[in-house]
Curated annotation (Swiss-Prot):
It catalyses: AMP + diphosphate = 5-phospho-alpha-D-ribose 1-diphosphate + adenine. This is Adenine phosphoribosyltransferase. Pfam families: Pribosyltran. It comes from Thermobifida fusca (strain YX). Keywords: Cytoplasm, Glycosyltransferase, Purine salvage, Transferase. Homodimer. One of its GO terms (biological process) is adenine salvage. The lineage of its organism: Bacteria, Bacillati, Actinomycetota, Actinomycetes, Streptosporangiales.
């Protein structure tokens, strides 16, 4: 990815120690979100490598992945699918549980959100342990979709989340 984008992320993503629990260093993207040029640059950088690709849907992971996934979907001419925390969707759902850096969780989507054969890009803000990404990939595939890749703003390389996603094309705008 461009050095400019990586530098921008380094400048506008701050570390919050011991959040949400002691020992975790949380990557706070809110400074990037409040800076219009930084936000636009990040969204463009997530979308541009895939312009002209056959992508039917962009799936965004709750909550911060939504911020990037919806505008990426618009840029790619694709629909948007929210992947939500358990119990947040009103219709019948498919669910996948996973481990994350600081606990366990479940991700859900509407059972009819991904028609079989759909080509789906997954977008999130940060790749940490890879648990959330792995659950999203498995969920999309279980619905009959084809995962064309996983794109993230920031990869925490030291947590080795990429290893859980060896079967998926992974794009990170920056790695720390």
């Amino acid at each position: 990815m461009s050095t400019d984008v990586s530098t921008l992320i380094d400048r506008y993503v701050r570390d919050i120690p011991d959040y949400p629990q002691p020992g975790v260093v949380f990557k706070d993207i809110t400074p990037l979100l409040s800076h219009p040029t930084a936000l636009r640059t990040a969204i463009d950088a997530l979308a541009e490598p895939l312009l002209g690709s056959e992508i039917d849907l962009v799936a965004g992971l709750e909550a911060r992945g939504f911020i990037f996934a919806a505008p990426v979907a618009v840029r790619l001419g694709a629909g948007f699918v929210p992947l939500r925390k358990a119990g947040k969707l009103p219709a019948e759902t498919l669910a996948e549980s996973y481990d994350l850096e600081y606990g366990t969780a479940t991700v859900e989507m509407h059972a009819d959100a991904v028609p079989p054969g759909s080509r789906v890009l997954i977008v999130d803000d940060v790749l940490a342990t890879g648990g959330t990404g792995r659950a999203a990939v498995d969920l999309i595939r279980r619905a009959g979709g084809t995962v064309v890749g996983l794109s993230v703003l920031l990869e925490l390389g030291f947590l080795k989340g990429r290893e859980k996603l060896a079967d998926v094309e992974l794009r990170a705008l920056a790695t720390v």
